[in-house]
Amino acid sequence: MNQSISSLIKLKFLQSHSNDKNGNKKGGSNVSTGIDKLRESESYRSPFLQLAEIQEHTNNDDDKLDVKECEPTKKHSKLSRIRRKMGRLDLNFRSANEKGSEDDEILVAQHLRNGQDPEEMPFKSENNIDSIEKVPKPDGERVTLTSSGSDNVKRNSKHAPFIPVKPALEKFPSSNRLSRDYRKSQEPTLFNGDRLVPTLPTVSRISTSSSVGSSTAASRYFNPSKRAVVASSSSSSSSIKFNSLHAIPLDATPQIELAKQQDEISKRRFGRRRSRTVDVFDYINKNNTAKNKPPLSPSSFIRTIDEKNTNSLMQDPMGSRGPLLPDDANIISNDTDGAEASHPDHQVLSRSRSQSTSFVQGKGGKRKSIEDEGYHNKLGLPHGSGPTSVYNNKSNANSTITGMSRRSSSIVNALSSFVNLRSSSLSSSRQQHLQQQQQLQQKLDVSLEDLPPVPAPEFSDSCKDFLIKLAPYGKFIGIILTEKDDEFKKNCLNYLLTNCFEFKNDPLDIALRKLLMFLELPKETQQIDRLIMAFSFAYYKAQKSYSKKKGIECPWSNADQVYFIAFSLLMLHTDYFNPNNKSKMTKHDFVDLVHNDKYSGGNEIPMAVLTYFYENVTAKESPKFNYFLMSPMALDDSILDKDAFDTNFAITLSSNSMYSPIDMIKRGSIIPKEASLSPIFYPLTNSISASGIAPSTAASCPPSTSGTINGANLGTANSNSNRPASNSISSYFSYNPSSSSSGNATLVQDDINVYSHIINDTLNEVNLFPEVSKYWNKNALKANLLRNEEHKYEKYYSIMNDTKGGYLRFHKSQLNKLNLPNFEILNDNSRSGCKNSDYKYCKILQMGAIMNLGMPSRKFSIVNSAKIHWKKEFAILTSLGLLICDKMDWINPQMMKDPKSGTTNYIIDFKSGFSFVPGSTIDVYNGLFADRERDSLGKSHFASLVLAYTEHHSTGSHTSNTTAASSSAKHNEGVFEPSSDEEDSITNSTDGTSSVSNGESDNDSVSSSDNQLSSNDSNEDYHSIKDEYPIFEDENADCLLYLHTCHRNFIWKCANKYERDNWIDSINLFSAYDGCYVEIGSIANTICNKRKLTILQRMERLRSIKSAKWEKLKKFESTLMLMGKCVPISTKTKTDMINRIRQLAVRMDWLIYEIKRSELFVSIIKEVTRKQAEKNILEHGKGEEEGQGNNDDSDGIDDIEESFLFNENSLQVCVSDSSYDEYSNE
C-alpha cells in the first residue's frame, strides 16, 4: 500500500516537473540541463515527497498550484530565482564555519551586481549536500548520507507544487531537545565542532492546561540524533517565504513540517481531547539545589525512581497525560517508506498524582532521572501534588522569552504565563513548609517490612501470650494476625478486639474509625475480609451485652448484618475519597443499595441511620496514623525516625503488656505504664484545645512545661526539635495537602474533631443521648394508670345502666350542626304524628364548669406574659361524646316524667343562637382518655400547649398562636411532626370502639394535632425535667387534668381534687365501654355511639392491640438507642438527626398511649364486672326483688344528684298535664 502511494506521488512529481519544463520553454527561460538533473535528484525530492503525501490526504487541491506563479519573467528573472530559492525549506545548518557563510553571502551579492546567476557557481568540495536517513541499521547505528558541495544548493522552481500551501503552525513551544546545545552534544563529530546557527526557539518546558492531545509536534516526530541534513540559511533573516501568502520560520525543516501536517490530521480526525485539570503543584520550576543533600532515609526504606517509573507505565489510552509531557512511545521518526525508529534513551514521564518523579536533561540529549544524577534521596512534593519536572534552565531563560514573544497571540502562551505566575508564587514559605512536613512523614512512615521478623507462636502460647510478643509491632498486629487463615491467629484477633477495644457505646462508623486508628488496614482483600469479620463479631457481642444490660432490644440482628454494613462503609469511604474516581456514590444510591438488601439484613436498618452513616463517613477522610506514636516504639526518645529504630527495637521486647488501645486511652498516654522505660512522655491531652484540633501541617514541639495526668508525674519536655510532640494528637495525622477528592475534606469550624474525642475518651459529650432524654421518657412504660385508691367506676356504670338521669334534647333540625360520628337510636319511637317525634335525646354522664388552658394571645401585656391564661368553659359528657361550650347561660334544666318508664328525668334543651354555638358545627370529642399526670404517656402529647407559655416565661414575648377555642388550632398545635410513613400508621379514629373494632383501621386513636410539627416550634429547646415547665410551679397539681381526644388535647384545672377524679373516672369508664353491647338505660329516641362488639370481644381486641403495639415499641426503642449513640461530625448532620429523634419519640409516645390506654380499659372492665358479679351474688342471696328495685332507684337518684352541679332547689318541676302529654309517647 505504501509503495503504491509512493509510486503515485513520484508519477505526479514527474508530471508536474514536465509541466514546469514546458512552462519555462514558453517563457523563454534558459536553464541548463545539468542543473535540472540536480534538482531532480532523490536527496532533494524526498522531504517534499513526504509533504506532498500528507498534503494529498488533507486537501487534494493543495498539490494543484498554479504553474504560472512560478513562471519567471524576463525582466526580473534573477530576483525570481533568488525568491524561489529562498522559498524552499531550510534545514537549519550553516556551512563549515560561520565566516564561510558570511563570505558566501558576500559572494552571492557580488554575482547579483554583475548580472551573473548565483546558481551557476561551482560547487564546493565539502560534504554539505542534503541527505536523509531512510532505513536504520539493525544494530542501532545511524546511517547518514552526505555529499559534497556548497550549502547554496541549486534548486529549481519545478518542485514548487510540493511546497505546502497551509503549513501547520506549532501550538506549543518547541522542545529543548532541538536546541543548539542539544544537537551539538548529540552528534559532536558530525559537524566537527563547528558552531551552529540558532534553530528552533528554546522555551521552558512548562505545561499548560490545554486540552490538545499531544505535546509539541517537533518533539513527537523529530529526532535530531537520527539524521543530519545540511542546508543554507541567512542568519539575519527571521523567516523565508514559500510564496507571497505563507511564511515558514527560519528553523523549519521538512521533517518538522511533516510532523506538523500529521499532527494536524490527527487533530482533525479525533478532535480536541480533554485532559485532566492542571494542578498548581503539577508544574513547578525547581532549582537543582538538592544534588548535594544527604539522603534522608536508607534506600531500602523507600522505593527508587525506577520502581516508580515502572509502576507508572499504565497509561491512559485517551490521552490523560499532561499536554507538555510527551509520551516517548509516540516519538517516531517517519520516512518515505514508513519506517519507524524507537528511542530507548527516553523515559516515560509519569502523571501519577501519588508519585513524584523528576527528570533532568543530561549530556548527549538524554533525559536522565534524578536517581542517575545522585538525586535518589531527594523527596518530592507531598502526596497528591502531582509530578514535578526538573529541567536544565541555564540555556532556557532567554529562549523562553523569545519563543513566547513569537506566540504572543496564542492561548497557550497566556496559559503558560499563568502557570509560570502561579509556580513562582509557590516558592514561598508555604511550599517549604509542605516539603518539610513531607520529609518528616517520610522519616516516620514505617511498613511491616521495615520491622524485624515476626515471631512464630509456640505450642504452649495462649492468645494473650502471643499478643504480648506482638506488642512491639503496634498497629501492624492486624496485618500479622490476618496474613493466613490460621485458627490460632483468628482466635488471637478475636481476643484482641474483644478485650483491648471498647465498642459498646460507639456507633458503627466511629467504631470502624477507632479500629483503623489503632490497627493498620491490610492491602490484601482476604486479609481485609478477615479483619472486618472479626471486628463485626466483637462489635455485635459488645452491643448485645449493652442492650441486655439496659433491658432493651439489640438494634443489630447478628454479626453478619454488622459485617455487611461495616464493609459497605469501608467501600463508601474508598469510593468517595479516591481522587481517580470522578463519579462518586450519592447519598440516595448508598441508602437505596443497602436498604434494599434483604439477604444481609440491610433492610432492617432505618433509613435515617443509613443517611447518618453516609454523611459521617464522607465528612472526613480517615487518616493514617504514625507508627512511632501509636506503638511502644515511642518508649525511647532516641528513636527519632526509622533510620535509628533498628538498634533500639530490642528495648521494647521485654514488655509484659499487650497492645491495648483501651489502656492507651484511659491512661491518657499511648505508652503503657508498666512498660515505660523512660520518664519522658507526654499525655495526649496536652495539645488538645477546646475547639478541636485539625491535622497539623508542621512538626510540633513537645510541651515546654511538665504536668500531671491521672496523678502521674510527667518529666520535663524533650528538647530535641527534630521530633514532634510525643503524644500530640496533631502529629497523629498523616497530612494530605491536596484532598481534592472531596469538597468538605477540611473540618468546618462548627464540626467536631472525632479523633480528638476518641483519644480523650469524650465521645459521650458529643453523642445524641442528651437529645434522646429530652424527648423520650423511659419510665413511661412503668406507670400504673389504674388508681389503687377508691375509684368511682361502679358509680358511673350504674348511671349509664339506669334510665333515670339527665338528658340533653335536640330538635331534628339542629342535629346537622353536631359533628356526630356513627350513631344509633335506642328505643326508637319516632313515628309520624307523635309529639316527640321531632326530638332526640343524649344521656348525660357528667357535666360541670372547668378551667381550660388557652393559648397566649398578642393582647397580653409584657407584664402579664408569665401568667397562665385559664379560660372558663362548660363541659358535658354524653352518650355521644364530650361537648365543650364557652358559657353556661343557656343551661336551663327542667324535670320531666317519662310515662313509659315512670321515671322523672332532668331535660336540658339545646337552643341554637347561644354563645356556645360556633356557627356551623359543634365538635363532639371521642376517643377520650384522661390522666392526672402530664408525661405519664410521653413528653410530646401536651408539649404544644406548654411550650408557648414556657417561651413567654423565659423571653417575655408572645407568639401568634391561636386560642384553644379556635377550630383551626387543631392543625397547628403539635410540636412534633411524624414522617409520611408514620402518618399512615397513626389514624384518627372517632371513638374508642371504632379504633378496636374496625379491622381496616390501624386501631390507633390519636390526635391529629399532635402528629403535626409547627414550623414556629420546630427549633424549640427543651429544658430539663425539673425546670422544663416552670409555669406550673404555682399551680396545684392535684387539680390538673390532662385529657386526650382524637381531635386535640386539653389541660383542665378543676375546682378541687374530688371533682378532677370524678371527671377522670367518668371519661375513662365511658371510653372503656364505648362501642360495646352494654345495657344503656334510656328513654325513647335516645342516641348513642354505634355498638359493634360484645364485652368479651372488646377485651380481646384491647389485649391484641396492646401486644402489637408493645412489639413495635420495643423496636422503636432499640432504634432510638441506636440514634442516641450517633456522633455526627457536621452540624447539619446533627440537626437532621435531632429532628429524626424527635419524630421517632412522637411515634413512641403514641404507642405508649395505645398500650396504657388499652391496659387501663381492660382493667376497668374487669373491675366493674367483678363488682357487678359480687353485687348480683348478694342480691340473689337476699331474694328481695322488690327491695332491690327500690334501692336501685334511690341509688340512681343519689348518683344523679351527686353528678350535677345544680341541686333540686334550682330545678323547675314540670307537673302540668301539657308537659306530661308532650313527653308521653302517645
Swiss-Prot record:
The SEC7 domain is sufficient for nucleotide exchange activity. This is Arf guanine nucleotide exchange factor SYT1. Present with 279 molecules/cell in log phase SD medium. Inhibited by brefeldin A. Residues 956-969, 994-1017 have a biased composition (Low complexity). Coiled coil: none annotated. One of its GO terms (cellular component) is mitochondrion. PANTHER family: ARF GUANINE NUCLEOTIDE EXCHANGE FACTOR SYT1, GUANYL-NUCLEOTIDE EXCHANGE FACTOR. InterPro entries: PH_domain, Sec7_C_sf, Sec7_dom, Sec7_dom_sf. Keywords: Cytoplasm, Guanine-nucleotide releasing factor, Phosphoprotein. Guanine nucleotide exchange factor for Arf GTPases, stimulating the nucleotide exchange from the GDP-bound to the GTP-bound form. Catalyzes both the GDP release by and the GTP binding to ARF2. Has no exchange activity on Rab GTPases. Involved in vesicular transport. GO terms for molecular function: guanyl-nucleotide exchange factor activity. Residues 131-142 have a biased composition (Basic and acidic residues). Residues 17-39, 113-158, 311-405, 954-1022, 1178-1198 are annotated as: Disordered. Residues 844-1074 form the PH domain. The modification Phosphothreonine is found at T277. SUPFAM superfamilies: Sec7 domain. Residues 349-360, 386-405 have a biased composition (Polar residues). The modification Phosphoserine is found at S369. Its main location: cytoplasm. GO terms for biological process: exocytosis; positive regulation of ARF protein signal transduction; protein localization to Golgi apparatus; response to endoplasmic reticulum stress; vesicle-mediated transport. It is found in: Cytoplasm.
